[in-house]
Regions:
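A short, N-terminal "cap"/entry segment at the start of jelly-roll beta-barrel domains
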Residues: 1-34, 69
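Conserved short histidine dyad/triad with adjacent acidic residue
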Residues: 23, 36-53
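Short, conserved beta-strand element in jelly-roll/cupin
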Residues: 41-43, 54-68
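A cytosolic small-molecule/anion-sensing beta-strand core signal
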Residues: 62-63, 78-79, 97
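Structural motif
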Residues: 65-67, 74, 90, 100
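Short acidic-glycine-tyrosine-enriched beta hairpin
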Residues: 72-88
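Ligand-binding loop in jelly-roll beta-barrel domains
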Residues: 87-108
């Protein structure tokens, strides 16, 4: 577990990671050989190129708005919404505005 998160304290995932102009930054929250939980912040217009998910994954939009390309179709997502990837699903992410998300991935 990441040391930035203290036991017995209330926190907001979206506040653990700042935005940086022109950049995408991420923070591992927790991981082991079977799962990975990461938060990411995207400056407006930045994104991840298409790649395949190594395992099933859930996206939790924490702040702002983004677009997820999944298997050839675009899906708009905003804070409070979620999205699922199947293992091997080809996808990309782009920030429409400054955008933060959490990713929970089950590793095979």
């Amino acid at each position: 577990m990441n040391n930035a998160i203290k036991a017995g304290e209330v926190f907001k995932l979206a506040e653990l990671l700042p935005y940086q102009d022109g950049k995408i930054i991420n923070m591992d929250v927790a991981h082991n050989e079977k799962m990975k939980f990461v938060i990411m912040s995207f400056d407006e217009g930045t994104g991840l190129s298409e790649h395949a998910a190594p395992g099933e994954a859930l996206i939790f939009a924490l702040d702002g708005e983004g677009v997820i390309g999944y298997e050839g179709k675009e899906h708009h997502i905003k804070a409070g919404e979620n999205f699922k990837f199947a293992a091997g699903g080809k996808h990309w992410v782009k920030a429409k505005s400054r955008f933060k998300m959490a990713l929970l991935m089950i590793l095979n």
